[in-house]
Amino acid sequence: MASLKVPATVPLPEEDAEQLYKAFKGWGTNERMIISILAHRNATQRSFIRAVYAANYNKDLLKELDRELSGDFERAVMLWTFEPAERDAYLAKESTKMFTKNNWVLVEIACTRSALELFNAKQAYQARYKTSLEEDVAYHTSGDIRKLLVPLVSTFRYDGDEVNMTLARSEAKILHEKIKEKAYADDDLIRILTTRSKAQISATLNHYKNNFGTSMSKYLKEDSENEYIQLLKAVIKCLTYPEKYFEKVLRQAINKLGTDEWGLTRVVTTRAEFDMERIKEEYIRRNSVPLDRAIAKDTHGDYEDILLALLGHDHA
């Protein structure tokens, strides 16, 4: 599942903190040292390193990284060094700003995280920005997009595997009726997608395909130029096949005229500890090229090195 490679024997946080402190000293920053430590520690270990660094050197490690690094490499290291909830809060805030607005990031956070992970992200958001995520999403969106996104970020889904098949059949019928009527922002359609567990939604969509001959997403393709419809399709993909969703984000980031470093960095840093191996499998299945080779072709230097390290590349 995770692509992150952590050594069997990990140095004490005090040792890692000392090595990082030394990496910032002298005439030039030792980027290789930073990568060799941070890109091979899990979230708990990175959190301990930050705490020890603050205690021993009276400095914030994130501020040190921000001061010493630059460009895409800095962004990747910073995002990776955040705690997961803290990182999601930052990404969500960036996605609501005028010049970095990205509703797809909100869908990613709401639909690919567990209920507890989303809850923790919202707590981190309140602590960091002194406002709620729901409040900001409602303020920065409008119309059908607001109608979809606010309940998405507000929900606390059941995370278990138990499924009500009778409910799945009845709600598949409801969804089909709404799609057939092109009532894409219908209250019941939004209620089902924003409140049901991922297992329940998968069962419902399976009934939809079996009973009506094609998937719900295929029906939505007719109006795929509409941003709301695109978001609706992203919600379905993130809830049911997140690896396919993230593969597409990576493919588009790499294949664009000029790499979309923001999309590339976001996916690698948020999925390396979770399901990046599945995403890599989906990428090679879809593109016939390994993800690490595609990234190596489109990036360079320290930025390339940290991305490859997080992908579990043997030489990074």
UniProtKB/Swiss-Prot annotation:
The modification Phosphothreonine is found at T100, T112. Transmembrane segments: none annotated. Ca(2+) 2 binds at I254, G258, D298. The modification Phosphoserine is found at S95, S288. InterPro entries: Annexin (IPR001464), Annexin_repeat (IPR018502), Annexin_repeat_CS (IPR018252), Annexin_sf (IPR037104), AnnexinD_plant (IPR009118). Expressed in flowers. The modification N-acetylalanine is found at A2. The keyword Transferase does not apply. Ca(2+) 3 binds at T299, E304. Induction: Up-regulated by cold, heat shock and salt stresses. GO terms for molecular function: calcium ion binding; calcium-dependent phospholipid binding. It holds the Pfam family Annexin. Belongs to the annexin (TC 1.A.31.1) family. This is Annexin D7. It comes from Arabidopsis thaliana (Mouse-ear cress). The lineage of its organism: Eukaryota, Viridiplantae, Streptophyta, Embryophyta, Tracheophyta.
